[in-house]
Curated annotation (Swiss-Prot):
Assigned keywords, A-Z: Cell cycle, Cell division, Cell membrane, Membrane, Transmembrane, Transmembrane helix
Protein family membership: Belongs to the FtsL family.
Subcellular localization: Cell membrane
Membrane topology: Single-pass type II membrane protein
Function, in words: Essential cell division protein.
Name under which the protein is recorded: Cell division protein FtsL
Species for this entry: Buchnera aphidicola subsp. Acyrthosiphon pisum (strain APS)
Ranges in the topological domain labelled Extracellular: 43-67
Segments traversing the membrane: 22-42
One of the protein's GO biological processes: cell division
Cellular-component GO terms for this entry: plasma membrane
Entry annotated with the keyword Calcium: no
Length: 67
């Protein structure tokens, strides 16, 4: 008797395409949303750091009597 082999990645891909379109769409949406949150937080932290640098420069100028 010959052992029958199945191509598991192909079966999983076909199942996703036939039965899991909504799940696949939601998975992509979740990954995209998480990526956008990370990018937004990163950019916000950069802006906060930049703002703190500007405030420190203003304080130094005030302490030196330049303003």
């Amino acid at each position: 008797m010959k052992i029958q082999r199945y191509d598991l990645p192909k079966i999983i891909k076909n199942d996703f395409l036939l039965y899991g379109k909504i799940h696949l769409t939601l998975l992509i949406a979740i990954i995209l949303s998480a990526s956008l949150v990370i990018i937004t937080v990163y950019n916000t932290r950069l802006l906060i750091t930049e703002e703190e640098d500007v405030i420190q420069k203003k304080k130094k100028k005030m302490m030196n009597g330049e303003i």
